[in-house]
C-alpha cells in the first residue's frame, strides 16, 4: 500500500515538472 502511495507521489511530481517544461517552451 505504501509503495502505491510513493508511486502516485512521484507521478504527480513528474506531471508538474513536465507541465513546467512545456510552459517554458
From Swiss-Prot:
Signal peptide: none annotated. The keyword Membrane applies. The keyword Transmembrane helix applies. One of its GO terms (cellular component) is membrane. Disulfide bonds: none annotated. Its main location: membrane. It is a single-pass membrane protein. It comes from the Eukaryota. The chain crosses the membrane at residues 4-24. It is found in: Membrane. Keywords: Membrane, Transmembrane, Transmembrane helix. May play a key role in the skin fibroblasts (FBs)-keratinocyte-like cells (KLCs). This is LASP1 neighbor protein. It comes from Homo sapiens. The lineage of its organism: Eukaryota, Metazoa, Chordata, Craniata, Vertebrata.
Amino acid at each position: 500500500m505504501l509503495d502505491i502511495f510513493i508511486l502516485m507521489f512521484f507521478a504527480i511530481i513528474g506531471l508538474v515538472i513536465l507541465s513546467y517544461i512545456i510552459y517554458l517552451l
